[in-house]
Amino acid sequence: MKNKQIIGLVVAGAVFIVTGVTSVLTNTLSANTMAEDVTTMLAGELEFDPPADDYIGVVNVVGTIQEQTQSSVLDTSSGYQHNTTMDYIDNLMDDSDNKGILLYVDSPGGAVYESEELHDKLIEYKETTGRPIWTYMAHYAASGGYMTSVTGDKIYANKNTVTGSIGVIMSGYDMSGLYEKLGIRYVSITSGVNKDSSKLTDEQVAIYQSQVDECYQEFVNIVADGRDMSADQVKALAG
């Protein structure tokens, strides 16, 4: 092959590589720009825009009540979005045209922190505005879902609704046997005897049990207040 042909192929290859890289960069920049544009557009669509007249706000609690996992409006993951729901209730509180909340619950429960925070926000709504909440329990309104439901002045349920489960659970895995079998040794250096709980001592089990008991008692008190019952009556039903 002649030198001129070789040089021509090398130049053509270089041009192809540069063009390809430029194309990738251009596509990436275009995609990022488009994502930013769509994010801005959707953020505007998600702004609180209530009706001009009196209305009832619908608060959907669907899915596991837990920390918000949606990091962007472009995230299409479904399920309960905690921060969004809390902000929405705040907006309803501040709007004088809002006359109440229809609370739609379809949740098997969730984390203690988010469940109680949602409950407290709904109670704050009622106490601040004096407006009612009507609860409808769909497929599930169990555990944290039930904690949320009892904020309703009126509670309605389908005949097939699964509800109740007034309790608290804390769980984990003891993998020490597996580690020993695989020859894996776990080492930790701590500042206190209870800092490391990889191998639970009786004292640590007692500490965790006291936390569970405290959360359970708070759950019982919430249900008792919401259902106009005594704590003993609730515990008798909870089992």
Task: Walk through the language-model features, giving the residues of each.
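Small-residue-centered hinge/linker elements
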Residues: K2-K4, A12-T129, Y140-G226
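Glycine-rich beta-to-alpha transition loops that act as phosphate-gripper elements at the mouths
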Residues: W134-A142, L237-G239
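Secondary-structure end/capping motifs
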Residues: F219-G239
